[in-house]
């Protein structure tokens, strides 16, 4: 029985932003890890993604979806899906971790390129454990570490572009040393725009107290990829007041579907539509862990809502 993602749009339509393409990711189905008993099997995720009306998908944690290029292409292709990019965690500030980082980034870049995609979303490791919230690294980088970060990011970006034709898109993240707007700007100001771009994650920018619209206006030429996400202002207040880690914040429901949170998706779409670039805009609503029947209806409602903001998903639904 096919999955039907049709429903009435929650808001009126507006002019479609022709330079933007909407997709989604395993994250929006509660997937954070390659393997976890609380996560959906990948075939159900792909079925529901297609059924919800999305055409583009990000690969998510390496090993969740098949890593054999032919198997992955078959699984994606038979559902009418396209790969927008890969996702990888890697260390930038510890030179002794470079070999380990370049190994996993290369694997993800190779798989990503095999599917015709051009972006690898790069997330530095968090300084808190995602499950326990325990702090396990420095929370801020000093000047020497920033110098290492810039050099390492440029080196990885250049190597991945030359070997696989992909661009590294740095993803600011909660509980990461690149989280606040000043930290994001410091990273961008010290890296090579030919090889390193920004994955603008609207929710994580808001989580870190940043201004998405300001970043788009001042660093628009560095934005190569987008995660669109909303955060609950009340949970953000709890994060600040109680010193919560991101894992606990997600359990409390910090990531919400539009239009419940910040930033306003319509404002983001309007600003992105002015950029001289074609951008993939991937829905990421962190839900880990969640009941298996929770993600699909949220994904349908989110696609409909964002379509009303001018973000087309490509796949037509009745």
For each predicted feature, which ranges?
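Acidic (Asp/Glu)-rich catalytic clusters
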Residues: 12-19, 46-51, 65-85, 103-117, ...
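Acidic/histidine-rich catalytic cores of soluble enzymes
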Residues: 24, 56-57, 151-262, 311-317
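Acidic-and-aromatic substrate-binding clefts and catalytic sites of carbohydrate-active enzymes
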Residues: 33-38, 56-71, 91-103, 174-180, ...
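Short, flexible, mixed-charge acidic loops at enzyme active sites
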Residues: 36-41, 126-136, 235-248
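C-terminal helical cap(s) of enzyme catalytic domains, especially alpha/beta-barrels
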Residues: 293-315
């Amino acid at each position: 029985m096919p999955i039907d993602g049709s429903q009435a749009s929650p808001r009126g339509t507006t002019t479609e932003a022709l330079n933007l393409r909407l997709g989604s990711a395993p994250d929006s189905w509660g997937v954070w890890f390659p393997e976890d008993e609380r996560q959906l099997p990948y075939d159900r995720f792909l079925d529901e993604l297609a059924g919800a009306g999305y055409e583009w998908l990000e690969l998510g944690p390496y090993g969740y979806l098949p890593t054999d290029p032919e198997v992955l292409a078959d699984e994606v292709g038979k559902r009418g899906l396209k790969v927008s990019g890969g996702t990888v965690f890697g260390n930038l500030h510890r030179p002794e971790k470079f070999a380990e980082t370049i190994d996993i980034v290369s694997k993800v870049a190779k798989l990503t390129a095999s599917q015709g995609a051009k972006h690898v979303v790069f997330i530095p490791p968090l300084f808190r454990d995602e499950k326990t919230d325990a702090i396990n690294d420095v929370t801020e980088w000093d000047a020497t570490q920033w110098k290492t970060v810039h050099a390492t990011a440029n080196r990885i970006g250049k190597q991945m572009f030359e070997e696989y034709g992909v661009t590294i898109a740095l993803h600011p993240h909660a509980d990461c040393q690149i989280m606040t707007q000043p930290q994001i700007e410091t990273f961008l100001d010290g890296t090579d725009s030919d090889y390193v771009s920004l994955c603008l994650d609207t929710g994580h920018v808001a989580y870190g107290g940043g201004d998405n619209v300001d970043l788009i206006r001042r660093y628009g030429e560095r934005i190569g990829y987008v995660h669109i996400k909303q955060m609950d202002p009340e949970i953000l207040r709890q994060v600040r007041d109680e010193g919560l880690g991101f894992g606990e914040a997600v359990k409390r429901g910090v990531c919400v579907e539009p239009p419940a949170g910040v930033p306003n998706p319509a404002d983001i779409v309007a600003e992105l539509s002015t950029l001289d670039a074609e951008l993939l805009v991937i829905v990421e609503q962190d839900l880990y862990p969640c009941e298996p029947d929770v993600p699909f209806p949220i994904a349908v409602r989110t696609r409909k809502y964002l379509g009303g903001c001018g973000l087309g998903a490509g796949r037509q639904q009745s």
